[in-house]
Regions:
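Alpha-helical structural signal in soluble globular domains
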Residues: 39, 80-84, 126, 186-198, ...
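Flexible loop/turn connectors
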Residues: 222-332
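Alpha-helical recognition/docking segments in bacterial nutrient-uptake
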Residues: 2, 57-162, 166, 226
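Hinge/beta->alpha junction and helix N-cap segments in small-molecule ligand-binding domains
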Residues: 66-76, 96-100, 149-159, 175-220, ...
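Periplasmic-binding protein-like
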Residues: 63, 109-115, 173-175, 207, ...
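N-terminal helix-turn-helix DNA-binding module of bacterial transcription factors
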Residues: 1-58, 73, 189, 323, ...
Length: 332
């Protein structure tokens, strides 16, 4: 099993830099932080040194379990968590799914914030109890000891889809993320219900399963580029996949939005840079609220079981103002 020294050597950084990343401190550059987090995941690092410290500070340490599907999104949430905790006398420990139960169940942290679609509900339910509250982002769990901060995905997706249909778009493809995640299910439900409401038909051959990563969007973009007839629009369950699909389309001389419109969800920094039509999720605020919820639960306050955040549609340049014609065949 890798140690902190192995991570530092592989990343080409100092031991203190790795320690700062593990503990959620903000004095590390974005690229360096992402590189260290990737190595932590790949090398299955369990922070033993941190674990020894936690045994003496168990009532002042918050665990943050993250997924590496989208680090841009994760970092904004983490900033919100850290900003709330830094003045509350709590330390922050970051870990991945592989080692999280160890820190949840061995008195090595006082509470946990979970942001990992791959972590199963039963793992959360095994650990949550009266003395160990958990706040889950983007999911709900049947336990009085698990609070949730979720995004109201459905109405936002309905609003965006109705706007796109009103602009003349009729034939759609949908690229899902992790199918079992609450976010993905609600985004797809908003997509399909709006299509049905408008009397349109969605062909299941145009339903693709991704994993929220840019690479899966790129793969689907390449597949669609080989099709004889493009759909009018590709609706993606997050921005990373939309960005990957756009890259594949451009490599195959398919114009966005003239030949195919593309949309995302989250409004990460890169989405703003390329003018991606998407739905803005206030990630910083989600992290801040999750930390607030957890600390209040630890202090014995009566906290609502679920807090719902409303996102906003951002129509940008990857969707035409008015769809006037359908491209019938791709010319290579």
């Amino acid at each position: 099993m890798a140690g902190i020294k192995d991570i530092a050597e592989a990343a080409g950084v100092s031991l203190s830099t790795v320690s700062n990343v593990i503990n959620g401190k903000r004095n590390v550059g974005k690229k360096t932080r992402e590189k260290v987090l990737q190595l932590i995941e790949e090398m299955d690092y369990v922070p033993n040194e941190a674990g020894k410290l936690l045994k003496t500070k168990e009532n002042h340490t918050i665990l943050f379990v993250f997924s590496d599907f989208d680090r841009s999104f994760y970092l904004e949430v983490l900033k919100g968590v850290n900003d709330y905790l830094k003045n509350k006398d709590y330390d922050l420990l970051i870990c991945t799914q592989r080692s999280c139960e160890k820190y949840m169940r061995n008195n090595m942290s006082s509470g946990c914030i979970v942001l990992d679609a791959a972590l199963r509900d039963n793992a959360i339910l095994r650990c949550a109890n009266e003395n160990y509250p958990i706040v889950a982002l983007d999911r709900t769990c049947a336990s009085p000891y698990v609070r949730s901060v979720i995004v109201d995905n459905y109405p936002a997706m309905c609003e965006m889809m109705q706007d796109i249909i009103d602009r003349g778009y009729r034939r759609f493809a949908f690229l899902s993320g992790v199918e079992t995640s609450l976010d993905n299910m609600e985004r797809y439900r908003g997509f399909s219900d709006t299509i049905e409401k408008n009397g349109l038909h969605f062909h299941q051959k145009n339903y693709f399963v991704g994993d929220y990563r840019e690479e899966s969007g790129y793969t689907v973009g390449k597949i669609l580029s080989l099709a004889e007839n493009l759909p009018d629009a590709l609706i993606c369950a997050n921005d990373n996949m939309a960005i990957g699909a756009i890259k594949a389309f451009r490599e195959n001389n398919i114009r966005v939005p003239e030949d195919i419109a593309v949309t995302g969800f989250d409004d990460i920094e890169r989405a703003q840079e390329i003018g991606l039509t998407t739905i803005t999720v206030p990630d910083y605020e989600r992290g801040y609220l999750a930390a607030l919820y957890l600390v209040e639960a630890l202090n014995g306050k009566d906290v609502a079981k679920t807090f719902q955040i409303s996102p906003k549609v951002k129509m940008r340049k990857t969707v035409l103002v008015k769809k006037t014609k359908i491209r019938s065949k791709i010319v290579k």
